Amino acid sequence: MENVFVFDHPLIQHKISLLRDKNTNTKEFRELVSEIAMLMGYEVTRNMPLKEVEIETPIGMAKTKVISGKKLGIVPILRAGLGMVDGMLRLIPMAKVGHIGLYRDPESLQPVEYYCKLPVDVEEREIVVLDPMLATGGSASAAIQFIKNRGVKNIKLMCLIAAKAGIERMQKDHPDVGIYCASVDEILNDHAYIVPGLGDAGDRLFGTK
């Protein structure tokens, strides 16, 4: 699968297994989502450009490197994407955070937008879209198209679990967008939930039904 990156790090795989467990409670689920997002964020940001600078240490002068080039923006898809934000901000505390609110119509299964707030300089940033579950790919594709319409050229999608159908939809609609995930599951059920998946990520994050 081109432009799809599946992380097989032992810590990520262990924590994904705990996420899948139906007996994992809400507090533990939230913590795991945040931890996995931080671990994945380390890899997602691997290719950020660096520049050399000179700084003064307590002992003397040193040539070292800092991140340069485009600034990073994080855009969670509401509501489940919110669970991944803190983990990313632990790595990149200066990143700007936008929000896109989408829900899936229960009849048509198509995404419906109800909220959008992006950084004013979003077109100057590299954007990482956060969505724990890539199921049909409809919501992620719609969110990414909206971001592209704002002039953004460099976009990545970070999710915890992806279904093959969602990956195929993304590759059809946005072949230029890299997909970063911890696991790929084979199928969707009749309600467009990933199988075996982990259930409804939003409900498990926020203790709702």
UniProtKB/Swiss-Prot annotation:
Pathway assigned to this chain's UniProt record: Pyrimidine metabolism; UMP biosynthesis via salvage pathway; UMP from uracil: step 1/1
InterPro entries (UniProt xref): PRibTrfase_dom, PRTase-like, Upp_B, UPRTase/APRTase, Ura_phspho_trans
Single Gene Ontology MF annotation: uracil phosphoribosyltransferase activity
Protein activity control: Allosterically activated by GTP.
Record keywords: Allosteric enzyme, Glycosyltransferase, GTP-binding, Magnesium, Nucleotide-binding, Transferase
Requisite cofactors: Mg(2+)
Domain of life: Bacteria
Family matches, as Gene3D superfamilies: 3.40.50.2020
Enzyme Commission number: 2.4.2.9
GO annotation (BP), single: UMP salvage
Similarity annotation: Belongs to the UPRTase family.
Function: Catalyzes the conversion of uracil and 5-phospho-alpha-D-ribose 1-diphosphate (PRPP) to UMP and diphosphate.
Descriptive protein name: Uracil phosphoribosyltransferase
Species this protein is from: Ruminiclostridium cellulolyticum (strain ATCC 35319 / DSM 5812 / JCM 6584 / H10) (Clostridium cellulolyticum)
Gene: upp
